Structures are given as structure tokens and as C-alpha cells.
Amino acid sequence: MRQTFEHFLNTATVMKSPKPLSISIFDYLKRFDSGWWCCCYSLNTVRKDNLPLPLFIHRDDIEYEIRNRETGIVFLNGFNVWHKGFEVNFLGTNAYYDVRNNLIFAALHEPDMSRIQMWKWISKFIITAVLKMRYEEAYFSWRGMIDFMKGPEWLMGTDAERLNNQLRKHLPDTEPMELEEQPTLKELQRCYNPDRNKKQFWKKITFNGWFLPADKEVGILRPYDAPFSIFRKKRIELRDTGAKKKRVAVREERQLFKAAMYCINTWRILMVQYGKTQKEYKTKYEILKNGKLWIEKILTNRG
């Protein structure tokens, strides 16, 4: 029997302001937000002067929800999204968007975040990429910071698809995997265990064995493996299980030096330029979320 619209509204999970909410499933959250999936916004919220930021991918949905969470969203009970696990793919070009878009988000919504905090998590991106011998991701992380500092005018004038294609040119060649691999339950539990990298003091101070004689046996690293699983390895096979691709990577000492330069450069630029760039994003915020900008970008891309 077809249900009435009134019945549908009564059975949907409505999330308004965080303060009066007493649904236990959300109790552990410090603040309430959601991605695009399985939720609806009022048409009074989705206006021409209140559209998502032109970020291409990553963080645009979270920024939109944080911006509008006081107006309330509706979660549709019974609706599900099947999505490939994020843990089965290496970051690739997403490392660029993770850094750039998180910096934009921080500039707009996290005024209390210090530049030292920003430097720490960007440096962690860079160092982790080198530990995994995925040197292109170290570059993408640094490049994301550089492009953020170019400001909102640069973002508004950028052809996002062309930029993404330029970034992809930095990706090394891969080849298909002969056999399909899926993570086991134990591997997934270890991947999401916050303590998985504890008790690794020796591996950390030796930079995962880079300062020690190399182990010549070929190692294997998958997206859900900890970088410490390839301790002292000189040569590894990177298996991107989600993309069903693989390639060989080799420990290169010059990449360690390059990562150090990225971190030093990031520190200098954050300390000198972040305040100015943050003000620019706040000043241009109304333009960034206005429908006129989207129309201009669409017409420009068509031309």
C-alpha cells in the first residue's frame, strides 16, 4: 500500500539543531554533520545564493552541511548507499584535494585551528607518503597547500577538470593485478585500530628503517597496510586492491630529502601567508557559494 507524504515525514529521521537531539546513535558525535548520502535539504536552504563550494571533490559536502546544519536535514530511513571501502585504494590525486580543501574548510569554519596544527597534519601526509614509497602523494600534499595559498580568485578561475588531469600526469605507470585481492576482517580491524602504530618507537626513529641497512627481500604494501609493515625494505610491490593495479617502488634517499624540503617550505609559507589567505576566503565566501559563479564556470568550460 502506498504511504502518504505525511506518513513518510513522520517516519523519517529529522535532525534539526544538535541541542534538542536525543537519538542515541548520534550521542557519541561532537558535532552533527553528514555527506550528501541518504539525506535531504529543504529547498529553502538550497538557494542560488547558498550552493556548495566549487571544490571538484572532497569536503564540499561536509562544508555545506556545517554551513547549514542549524536549518536541519532529513535522513531517509531505509535508503542505503553501497560504496567501495575507502581503505582499499591508495590516495593518489586525492592527497591534493585532502590538503587543499581541508585548508579552505579551516579558513572558513575553524578559526581556532593554529598554523602549527596545520603544519603537523600536512607534514604527516607528506612523511607517510614517503614511508609508503608513494612519492607522488608527498608532492600532491605539498601542492595542495601551495594552491590553497593562491587564494579564492585562483580557485574561481581554475578549470577543475583540466587541473585534475594535470595532477594525474604525475601518477606512475601501473599494470593490472593477476589475482583479485580483498582485505580480510582481521586486516580491516587492524586498519581502523587507532593503536595500530603504537609500540613502533624503533621503526619511527629510524624512519621505518631508511637509516638502517636495507632488507633486499621484496615487500608488499596494500592501501590498508600500515607503512611499518615494510620496515627496512629496499623494494616493494604496491598493490592497489580497489583499482586492481600494481607497481614496483624503490627506496630513494633523495625522496627523503625532498620530503624534508616540502615540510620546511610548508612551515615557512603557513607562518607568513596563511593569515592573508584566510581573510581572502572569508571576504569572497558569499561569491564562492553563489550560483552565478557556477554558471560562469559552466559557460567557460563549454567555451
Model-derived segments and their meaning:
Residues 18, 34, 74-76, 114-117:
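Short hydrophobic/aromatic-rich motifs at helix boundaries and adjacent loops
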Residues 64-73, 89, 97-102, 144-147:
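C-terminal, active-site-flanking charged/polar segments
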Residues 76-92:
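Active-site donor/metal-binding and catalytic loop motifs
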